[in-house]
Amino acid sequence: MFDIDGLVSDSLKLLADRVDKNYRISLVIVGPPGSGKSTIANELCERLNSMFHEYLKEHGGNIEISGVSEPLPVDITEPIREVSRNIVEYMTSNDGILPQSVEDLDFECVKFQDDGRDNGNVNGNVKVIGRGGLPNAIEVSPYHDLSKPKEKCDVNIAQIIPMDGFHLTRKCLDNFKDPVNAHRRRGSPSTFDSNNFLQLCKLLAETSNTKIPLSRFQNSDNDDVDAVWEKLAKTFTSDVQDIYIPGFDHSLKDPTSNQYCINGFTRIMIFEGLYLLYDQENWSKIYQVLSGTDALLIWNIDIDEAVIQDRVAKRHLNSGLVNTFEEGIDKFQVNDLLNARSIRQHTLDVKDVVTIHND
């Protein structure tokens, strides 16, 4: 089993080291199917948020919202090319996708402003899309008012950022040159919108590099946990845009838009996914983007194939993807096992990765 206390301790050490330099730190949990990435990420997220909530409870619940010392651009999506309204309407009429682009690993992510024509919801948000189209869209809000959430439970400093929300939809897979194989191999590297996930990492890395005024703490060498919580509580900013990303439930089979929100309270980003250390196509660039913030910690889960076979077969059964446990094993062996071995074969050779076990 994994040592959650050790992961929490390592996370807090990184936070203490970088809180004066980065608005956000990045924690990455990577491993094969069935390795427990989501379970670990959720438990770590809950522990960190609970610790901060307890600090607020013991210290009157006061938080301060300020500006940043090195402001971000008004719109962090500014460098992204804007797409015409005709293209948006074309996507809308094609299940939200660009059929001719679903396999284009070199697709350049584009953006458009949501004017409410398609859903009646005029919010001024900017949608960023990759080759997966609207179902895998990143939505960036121009509004970042942090003054409303006054309850301590609303101030969550840790947020999970799952790669799974960037599964290409079944409609996308239908438009592959070999749709039968695309569906059979769903979960392999090419069946994710790696273009847009990489774009998400770039946007979040930019927010991580934002610095905040900490002059009142500069004469203090105290880096215990309460001192770190105090710095966070006094240095939230509304100048960081809200970023919404899709989630994924295996039983629903396709992504759910805007399931997660990274807002101004988010100071710890917990990335989890299969291919975050993969050395092929767009995945190979993620490490460089996140490590460029100098506020990164990576855990790679090493686990026996027999263990993940049992777990994934049960997950397939519970999600309704198969009718029996034996069918779940068969599905694992013709797809998930291939992905697991590919991950092991194509993991980036970088030094600052901590191996953990979750058998």
Curated annotation (Swiss-Prot):
GO MF, any single term: kinase activity
Entry keywords, A to Z: ATP-binding, Kinase, Nucleotide-binding, Transferase
Q: Which EC number applies?
A: 2.7.1.-
Write down the InterPro entries for this protein, in alphabetical order: P-loop_NTPase (IPR027417)
Record-linked SUPFAM superfamilies? P-loop containing nucleoside triphosphate hydrolases
Q: Which domain of life is it from?
A: Eukaryota
What positions does the entry give for ATP binding? Answer: 31-39
Which residue windows are coiled coil?
none
Q: In UniProt terms, what function does this protein have?
A: ATP-dependent kinase that could be involved in endoplasmic reticulum membrane assembly.
Concerning its family, UniProt says: Belongs to the YFH7 family.
Question: What is the protein name given in its UniProt record?
Answer: ATP-dependent kinase YFH7
Native organism is Vanderwaltozyma polyspora (strain ATCC 22028 / DSM 70294 / BCRC 21397 / CBS 2163 / NBRC 10782 / NRRL Y-8283 / UCD 57-17) (Kluyveromyces polysporus)
What gene name is given for the protein in this entry? YFH7
